[in-house]
């Protein structure tokens, strides 16, 4: 012990090169590649997760009609933007719906019109990119008609990846115009380049101020009107009101001013809404007929894919919604989409769709058809389309 070797070094003095060396740190390139690979794995996982609820289930299974949105849609329009919303430079006067008289006495405006039905529901992929896109004023609006099939048309269109629509009825151009366009825009869903923003409020078609107001927003707005046999539409309208207020008078008593003389009471909105030619005249003062598409409510039942093809063409969209998206629900008697938007499960519109209509006296129906016939013929001429109601 303590003996020194030649050269004056202790036996414990071992050359450093004989000791094990720590591994060299990985070069920066390896770290970057590892981080990039990890990020790619996370992105791929999120993409596949999103597609599981969206790519495999584009269409939505919904019945025809204009009722409330399917229950799976989450709320999105409950609040207005923070702070005081910008307003138009004037206080807009109350809109003047052409419906009046008995309708006001009955309080027949349904809850579906009075409050938002169900707000917009983004698909899983759009939720993943919720920070993307921007809110735009609508480029297309379904303006009517009540009980014509507007809800079904909107839900069918929402299957299309290039259509983004607000689920509730905004009622901006008839009830909330004084809140301003900034408030209206904030109700809309976010869209990406190439997507169309839409909304539907059937009461616009019978509101005198609506054509000028929409034109002031944009003269290029595309307008869609879903129309239906006015007699059937009136009975459906009455049936909806009856379900809310069972104590209202009979359809027959509301239809006539004087049944003996056969005078139809056009102050009742259920009758007045069906005078399509009269309402269309107001719209043609502000929009050319080429900017309006008239969809047959009857064909939405008998040939939904065909009617949706016309709508997609009108909106400049690729024909993605086709026959393969639909099946016929024998219980309800309506076509449905095979899969709901953002879901792999079938779903039809609510229980209020396909209500059984009350029995109406055949003589009343005959007189109503006689009343509507000249208006229908004029409507056919104005639109260039025979809807075959007579």
UniProtKB/Swiss-Prot annotation:
- One cellular-component annotation, GO: plasma membrane
Where do Low complexity bias regions lie?
Answer: 123-133
Instruction: Give the UniProt subcellular location, in the record's own words.
Output: Golgi apparatus membrane
A GO BP term here is:
branching involved in ureteric bud morphogenesis
Q: Where does 3'-phosphoadenylyl sulfate bind?
A: 147-151, 228, 236, 353-357
Which residues are modified by glycosylation?
Answer: 258, 329
Biased composition regions of type Pro residues, renumbered to the chain? 83-96
- Name assigned to this protein: Heparan sulfate glucosamine 3-O-sulfotransferase 3B1
* Species this chain originates from: Homo sapiens
